[in-house]
Amino acid sequence: KEGYIVNLSTGCKYECYKLGDNDYCLKECKLQYGKGAGGYCYAFGCWCTHLYEQAVVWPLPKKTCN
């Protein structure tokens, strides 16, 4: 599974500005989804890879980013 990492309290994606390989995105993906996850910056959001199937990613149902 893949997807944008999401702030569970706000429903917002994690923003990034350095597209492609991005240490911030990689670190955040690993923190939220485990050490097997990968991450990079895609379309100014942190995109996480190698997630378990039940991983919660953006968008959250009934929670829009405010």
From Swiss-Prot:
Regulation: Is susceptible to be neutralized by human antibodies scFvs 10FG2 and HV.
Domain LCN-type CS-alpha/beta: 1-66
Tissue specificity remark: Expressed by the venom gland.
Cystine residue pairs: 12-65, 16-41, 25-46, 29-48
Domain commentary: Has the structural arrangement of an alpha-helix connected to antiparallel beta-sheets by disulfide bonds (CS-alpha/beta).
Family to which this protein belongs: Belongs to the long (4 C-C) scorpion toxin superfamily. Sodium channel inhibitor family. Beta subfamily.
Name under which the protein is recorded: Beta-mammal toxin Cv1
